[in-house]
């Protein structure tokens, strides 16, 4: 896997409590479990999200430099359901278009009494850089390049825990564009921290890690043996925007070789769950019958994403 870009002391205060969420590397099982437990407490017995006044004295700014539907909207809803004031910064018409440095823009917003920034950016490590030089606010990484997507990994862990109860003895397959996926990078870290030892990465060799210690994960370039008796299947899309044109697979050929079809899903355990971080490309990485089937928990992941983001915001604000 790639080199860790997170200096963990930046994420934690002297008491070991989270003040930023930049990535999951170096965070303990206790840290992750605390977030999952907090998120669970924000979901009622009917599966509906509770409202909270926890952040009613706070202002949160969303800075999304990459397109997003699920992540941006769930962060906004999470902040609103926690009673925070939310600002979606109009980057297309901001001073950044006049070549203002991002840190200067954020310092200006901080002077407007912003307490927390949610950042998505194509540059690996940018939220870490901002957290290092911008004091007095919390930084929440909503995805940086191919490096990390901590809240997606956490919401995936929440969804898994709701169905499987424990992470030990699980077999988890991650299928798709592994090398370009920040979801895979953070998800593997979360699974290992929570005790999962059978993690299987399934992808064409060109989309697989160049190197990965065999003691940590198993790598497959054939989907069928990789899926055998799995408890959880996480499907990833082809991230064409991050690929060199010559390396972009033919979609039909990819589906024929690596698409999750009902026949292939039948190789997993009968109670296996199917997950996808979205957006879904039907007929490329997953068959619609599987995406909409009774083993799919894709829409539950979206709801769980709001709960996780509420939990993280409240924890960062020292409200939990």
UniProtKB/Swiss-Prot annotation:
GO BP annotations of the record are: 'de novo' pyrimidine nucleobase biosynthetic process; 'de novo' UMP biosynthetic process; amino acid metabolic process
Q: Which SUPFAM superfamilies match?
A: Aspartate/ornithine carbamoyltransferase
Q: Which cysteines are joined by disulfide bonds?
A: none
EC number(s) in its UniProt entry?
2.1.3.2
Q: Which residues bind carbamoyl phosphate?
A: 70-71, 120, 149, 152, 278-279
Catalytic reaction(s) noted: carbamoyl phosphate + L-aspartate = N-carbamoyl-L-aspartate + phosphate + H(+)
Out of the domains of life, which is the source? Bacteria
Q: Which GO terms describe its molecular function?
A: amino acid binding; aspartate carbamoyltransferase activity
Q: Which GO terms describe its cellular component?
A: cytosol
Q: Which residues form the signal peptide?
A: none
Give the protein name, as stated in the record: Aspartate carbamoyltransferase catalytic subunit
Q: Which family does it belong to?
A: Belongs to the aspartate/ornithine carbamoyltransferase superfamily. ATCase family.
Q: In which residues is L-aspartate bound?
A: 98, 182, 237
| Organism, as annotated | Vesicomyosocius okutanii subsp. Calyptogena okutanii (strain HA)
